[in-house]
Each structure stands twice: as C-alpha cells, then as structure tokens.
C-alpha cells in the first residue's frame, strides 16, 4: 500500500509557504495568530 506522506519541498512551500499564507485573508489571520503566540517559525 502506498503511504499517505510523499514528501516534496515544492508542494510543501506552495501549500504552506509564507506567500501562500499572505495570499488569503484567513492565511494572514494564521500568520497574525502565530506572531501573537511568539512562534519563531511562521510558515513552512
């Protein structure tokens, strides 16, 4: 059986990267929350 996690850095960046987060209002909300929490890493 094929495993569900097939790592790809390109897909990872496109789906969870900083620019994709900034592209939508909800994505910006996520970044805002992570900044408020004090995360050192905001996105993938």
Swiss-Prot record:
Biased composition regions of type Basic residues, renumbered to the chain: 30-44
GO biological process, one term: translation
Cellular component annotations (GO), alphabetically ordered: ribonucleoprotein complex; ribosome
Keyword Ribonucleoprotein: yes
Stored InterPro entries: Ribosomal_bL34, Ribosomal_bL34_CS
Keyword list, A-Z: Ribonucleoprotein, Ribosomal protein
Molecular function terms, GO-annotated: structural constituent of ribosome
Region called Disordered, residue ranges: 1-44
Keyword Nuclease among UniProt keywords: no
Gene3D superfamilies associated with the record: 1.10.287.3980
Pfam families assigned to the protein according to its UniProt record, in alphabetical order: Ribosomal_L34
Entry-linked PANTHER family: LARGE RIBOSOMAL SUBUNIT PROTEIN BL34M (PTHR14503:SF4), MITOCHONDRIAL RIBOSOMAL PROTEIN 34 FAMILY MEMBER (PTHR14503)
HAMAP family the record matches: Ribosomal_bL34
Family the UniProt entry places it in: Belongs to the bacterial ribosomal protein bL34 family.
Protein name in UniProt: Large ribosomal subunit protein bL34
Protein species of origin: Rickettsia africae (strain ESF-5)
Gene: rpmH
